[in-house]
Swiss-Prot record:
Residues 531-563 are annotated as: Disordered. The keyword Signal does not apply. Residues 1-14, 381-390, 453-460, 511-601, 661 are cytoplasmic. This is Vacuolar membrane protease. Belongs to the peptidase M28 family. SUPFAM superfamilies: Zn-dependent exopeptidases. It comes from Lachancea thermotolerans (strain ATCC 56472 / CBS 6340 / NRRL Y-8284). Residues 531-554 have a biased composition (Polar residues). Its cofactor is Zn(2+). Zn(2+) 1 binds at residues 153, 165, 223.
Length: 962
């Protein structure tokens, strides 16, 4: 009985392969689901201290997310004051703690801000910024040790409440301050609760100007680029910092260096404060929420759509990491500062390695394993254990994969034409459709070829072919590692898959090389037809596949996978094999010969589960992060669909050597799953309330527009029905306003209509636009007879603007356009501390690039390579002006000057307002500040969400010429 059971269990037959495949997919699926939801069941119920921290943090989160609070709003000041009160309260009585408030201390900086999204950009943007960061210092008992900066930002965008971005990070900082105010750490910790991250990462830049900046060498940045879920280790500086995270975060570590490479390669277009700190020389960790993108920066970024489980997930990881750095000793060798490869395994294990070590490993396995394969092939050829005329067998898998790829690619192209935005709602269905379509087509082609010409070599030949395919992929990945200076931290899955395919190929070749030569088995049982004995595992012909009964006890027992692993003691069977050498006489040799026939089970169990798990783990992480970027344009949609298709095919590839052994039932299940996934992908609506269409709003007014139109701009994905949405709101229906949509040529469009005017400021009467914004030129010596034609031109102006915190000035001339061509003639800007013209400043101009101050503490910034734009921020709503000076060079000094060139300088002035969830009092009546946005939120379908397009919701424009 045992012999018959083992014979049936380990036989290379359709039922066994099918059961193992189904079991593999079920286990991998359950592990993936558990990894996704596990954090929801990990609240600190048994730890009183942690529970108190969590409860207090949740109350704090609710307090700071009552309203949107961008830097440009008064609510931003309310959040600042609340946080200042909280940290002062938390550190009270702690002699090793100190609080600094940039608002009171007047941290005003003027600096040239590099383009954090494009390191090769030559654009020169000068920023004048008044900071209101709250900085807390916890002095360590060993302050000589390198300190740790922990940072998060408390501003939100104008359209969001800022719960995940970045309220959770802020209240996590409050929890950490609570802990270390009571328990002094060894290292000094500095907490930067910074303001105005959303529009320029300016709060982080302001910290670099703070007196406590020299105390820290490490940084932990907490961010939210999604809305809830789990917080991931986006990136870390190097192998040392990755190892610190590994040693610190023992409970539910979560991170993957695939995301890190996406930042390196600029596939992720947004940035976090971590970039500023990294450029300043700090090393550390960037931990952030990363999905779903469609709720990010919308009104649904609120406590209603996140949870205490998400809060605890970020808080617990931060506590573990901060505790380790604060209290433990660790090595930080300079030699281990190459970029790191890292990933977690279902939140239980964390693996990290140097990319240089990965490069070395790749070089070794690229060289050694092919030699092993070739040696085994040579042995097989010498021993003649391979069947004759193998060329057609070697062509089967490439032919099958080619046909399957063509059909799968056609499926993807059709989906891209019919329902391209389905990925924004659900990437799982298309990916399953791609994967199972590819698998079932390979099954059909390979099964047909096997039926027409049975082969005993197909499985191992397939592994060898897949090995060489992965060899090419690994060669590319290794070259990529080298050429990227080891920043390609996301290529490690190729190494893993290469090693797995290599193992499968080597096992098959070893078993083939040391088996007996080709022979024919003669079975007395009429139910067993003659079959070759054995190269690799004996593979049934289609006629044999239907016969699953065990052979008669009196029939000969073959030395193949149908034999039991251990012989029965009373066995009296004899071999009836022809054309073979004498059977092994010893029981050990007989066992080895018999065991060699079970190579298929070793191959399957080692390759398919591990490869499937690894592919699903990496693919789900990638698609989780990018699937809703398909709303950003044609190219983004194409990229998401391509990754989904290639990932689905990669999931099927480890099964290909075995797929022709799937039975009818499983093949029909796969076919049904592929068809169902395809139908869902084609027919379902791409947007739902939980996965909405994300549109971006702005409203613009031009100061000298005689008609006084207030233009509402709605930006979004072309083909998503934006025009129809806008035609169904009261403003366009009642006033018969025309909706005009223009494409940007890349899959996005901007639709415009005349909307209700905003009410930006309170007034006793209906204010004119010129009452809100006006430009006054105080001086301009361009046409002065006292100025030499070779002398720089100087001008001063005041921008009078009410209840405002942000204006920008873009420069252009006859030879220069702000973002298009030429070098700006503007070489110097001055930020005056008052609104009054003062000629004394002109004689004190700096001759060096950079920032200087005059006797009146006016800030002067000089940049001889040209200044493209000036960004002006201020904190005081009651100071209704910006006073600036501008110096530019006459065209006569330009090599590109011509007769039509003019010395005139054009100024495009834009001022931004970011409040909408508040009111103004106009002529005694209560008016909502931005009724156009209120209208869109009220009357748009529930499947639509809105975010801001610009730094403010309302922009007032003016243009003057100096």
């Amino acid at each position: 009985m045992l012999a018959q059971f083992l014979r049936s269990l380990f036989r290379f037959r359709k039922t066994t392969v099918s059961v193992l495949l189904v079991a593999t997919y079920v286990v991998v699926f359950l592990l993936n689901v558990w990894d996704r939801i596990r954090y929801q069941y990990s609240l600190p119920e048994d730890n009183k201290h942690h529970k108190q921290l969590l409860d207090a943090s949740w109350i704090d989160l609710q307090s700071i997310t009552r309203k949107p609070h961008p830097y440009t709003s008064r609510e931003n000041d309310a959040v600042h004051d609340f946080l200042l009160h909280r940290v002062t309260e938390l550190v009270e009585g702690a002699p090793h703690a100190e609080v600094s408030d940039d608002y009171k201390e007047g941290n005003h900086l003027v600096f040239k801000q590099p383009d954090v999204f494009n390191s090769s950009s030559t654009e020169s943007r000068i920023v004048s910024f008044e900071s209101s960061n709250i900085v807390v210092k916890i002095t360590g008992s060993q302050p000589e040790l390198p300190g740790l900066l922990i940072s998060a930002h408390f501003d939100s965008v104008p359209t969001a409440l800022g719960a995940t971005d970045d309220g959770v990070g802020i209240v996590t900082l409050l929890a950490l301050i609570t802990r270390y105010a009571k328990k002094q750490p060894r290292r000094t910790l500095v907490f930067n609760l910074n303001n105005n991250e959303e529009f320029g990462l300016l709060g982080a830049s302001a910290f670099l100007n703070h007196r406590w900046r020299p105390l820290v060498d490490y940084v932990l940045n907490l961010e939210g680029t999604g809305a809830g879920g789990k917080a991931v280790l986006f990136r870390t500086s190097d192998t040392n910092t990755a190892s610190i995270y590994k040693n610190a975060v023992k409970t539910q570590p979560f991170g993957n260096s695939i995301y890190q490479q996406a930042f390196y390669d600029r596939y992720i277009s947004s940035e976090t404060d971590y970039k500023v700190y990294e450029q300043a020389g700090l090393r550390g960790w960037d931990i952030a929420f990363y999905k779903p993108r469609a709720l990010y920066h919308t009104i649904k970024d609120s406590t209603q759509f996140t949870s205490q489980a998400s809060l605890w997930n970020m808080m617990h990881a931060s506590l573990q990491l901060a505790d380790f750095i604060a209290f433990e000793s660790f090595e930080d060798e300079p030699k281990d500062r190459s970029p790191a490869v890292y990933f977690d395994i279902i939140g239980t294990f964390f693996v990290t390695a140097s990319t240089k070590d990965l490069f070395t490993l790749n070089c070794v396995v690229l060289s050694v394993i092919p030699v092993i394969i070739l040696v085994l092939e040579f042995v097989i050829q010498r021993r003649k254990t391979r069947e004759r005329n193998p060329l057609l067998v070697w062509l089967r898998l490439p032919f099958s994969m080619f046909i399957s790829y063509l059909v799968t690619a056609t499926f993807r192209s059709s989906l891209f034409r019919v329902n391209p935005l389905i990925f924004s709602r659900d990437y799982v269905s298309p990916t399953i459709g791609f994967s199972f379509t590819f698998l079932i087509l390979n099954y059909l082609v390979l099964s047909l070829l096997e039926y027409l010409a049975p082969s005993r070599d197909l499985k191992t030949v397939s592994f060898v072919e897949l090995f060489f395919g992965m060899w090419i992929a690994l060669l590319w990945a290794t070259i990529r590692l080298c050429t990227s200076k080891y920043t390609a931290t996301g290529v490690y899955p190729i190494t893993v898959l290469y090693l797995l395919m290599s193992f499968g190929a080597i096992v098959g070749l070893v078993c083939s090389a040391f088996k007996r030569k080709h022979s024919v088995v003669k079975a007395k049982d009429s139910e067993e037809t003659a079959a070759p004995n054995t190269y690799s595992s004996i593979e049934e012909s289609p006629q044999q596949a239907t016969n699953t009964e065990a052979p008669n006890e009196n029939s000969p027992e073959e030395h193949d996978e149908r034999a039991p692993l251990l012989r029965a003691s009373n066995s009296s069977q004899v071999s009836s094999v022809t054309n073979v050498s004498e059977a092994p006489s010893s029981a050990l040799k007989a066992f080895v010969v018999s065991a060699l026939n079970y190579d298929w089970s070793v191959q399957f169990l080692a390759v398919v589960p591990l490869a499937s798990f690894f592919v699903i783990m990496c693919l789900s992480l990638i698609l989780d992060g990018i699937y809703q970027t398909c709303q950003e344009g044609f190219q983004a949609t194409w990229n998401v669909s391509k990754i989904s298709m290639l990932g689905g095919m990669l999931l099927a590839i480890p099964v290909l050597p075995f797929c022709y052994k799937l039975n009818y039932f499983v093949s029909m299940v796969l076919l049904f799953a592929a068809a169902s996934a395809g139908i869902f992908s084609f027919e379902r609506a791409p947007f739902t309330e939980s996965s909405p269409l994300k549109l971006r709003f702005s409203q613009e007014l031009n100061l000298h527009d005689e008609l006084g139109f207030s233009t509402v701009n709605v930006f979004g994905r072309q083909g998503a029905g934006i025009e129809q949405i806008l035609r169904n709101i009261p403003s366009t229906q009642n006033a018969h306003s025309n909706v005009e949509c223009t494409s940007n040529g890349q899959g996005s469009e901007t639709c415009r209509y005349a909307g209700p005017r905003p009410h930006l400021v309170s007034s006793s009467s209906i204010p004119e636009l010129s009452d809100i914004l006006s430009i006054k030129v105080l001086s301009n010596n361009r046409k002065s007879s006292g100025r030499s034609s070779y002398e720089p031109i100087n001008a001063e102006l005041v921008i009078n603007v009410k209840e405002n915190r942000l204006c920008t000035i873009g420069f252009n001339s006859s030879q220069f356009a702000e973002h298009d061509y030429g070098q700006s003639p503007v070489k110097q800007v001055t930020i005056f501390g008052n609104a009054h013209h003062d000629n004394r400043t002109r004689s004190q101009l700096s001759t060096l690039d950079g920032l200087s101050r005059d006797d009146e503490e006016n800030r002067i910034f000089k940049w001889n390579r040209g200044i493209n734009s000036l960004q002006l921020h201020k904190l005081d709503f009651e100071r209704n002006y910006y006073h600036v000076g501008i110096q530019w060079m006459p065209t006569i000094l330009s090599q590109d000057a011509d007769e039509e060139s003019s010395d005139a300088l054009g100024l495009k002035i834009r001022c931004f307002w970011g409040e909408y969830d508040s009111v103004s009092i106009i002529n005694g009546e209560v008016k909502r500040k931005v009724p156009a946005l209120d209208e869109l939120l009220a009357y748009s379908p529930k499947e639509v969400s809105f975010s801001n397009r610009e730094a403010g919701l309302v922009i007032v424009n003016d243009y003057i010429e100096l």
